[in-house]
Amino acid sequence: YAQLKPEEIAHIPDVDLVLGAEQKLNILDYLDDLHKQKGNGTIITTQSQDIRTFSPSCSRGDRTRYFLKVQDGCDYYCTYCTIPFARGRSRNGSIAELVKQAETVAASGGKEIVLTGVNIGDFGKSTGESFFDLVKVLDRVEGIERYRISSIEPNLLTDEIINYVATSRRFAPHFHIPLQSGSDEVLKLMHRRYDTALFKSKIQKIKSVMPDAFIGVDLIVGVRGETEQFFNDAVRFVYGLDISQLHVFTYSERPNTQ
């Protein structure tokens, strides 16, 4: 919100300071220089395309599992999504940094880590590494009993990742894969980077090596340009998938979506 509509927030009564995505983690630095003034709040932001900072974090809150952020931002610019404008370009921490975070979790008694990010399969753009490299190294951290991979794009879920999870002692056979639509025509409207044939092949690959794997799938309905025929095509496609769970959302039209 602050990255997308800073002026709107600055006009809210009693708002003194609005920080963008790159500045928010250093809020104390800005508070020292903040002076109460009449008028709208002070805005300090960076253009989304210029955001380069990655701040690794690992949180648990009141949960029994930890969430380790390995990547942030997205370069995909799907027509229904504002994340690239709110979170900036794809970037990530180094494998060495993230392994230290996992080791800290293990030392504190944590047993499960969920790997999170905006587009985690795109991991490595900042460091010249790959998500598969990260998976293999984290699998060697003693003390962690289970990892889960959060939502990963089907075109970035490689066979080598699937095969590795199938034989890993620590990576759970648990996948969350955004389909968004089961209609190839709608996928084109969305500017997605795969078609239904590729998506189905990923499901079949997972089930061929992990018959009991859990597979969750995201769907969006009602996007601009989706006809009744396209919707029915999507329903038929989904019925033919061997999956465990559906997350279904209605399209939400917002500024910067198409």
Task: Describe each region flagged by the PLM.
Residues 1-122, 175, 197-204, 208, ...:
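Proteins enriched for Cys/Gly/acidic motifs involved in redox and nucleic-acid/cofactor modification
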Residues 66-67, 80, 149, 186-189, ...:
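Residue-level recognition of specific faces of alpha-helices
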Residues 4, 107-231:
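Conserved SAM/AdoMet-binding glycine-rich loop
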Residues 36-39, 143, 170, 243:
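Generic structural signal for secondary-structure transition and capping sites
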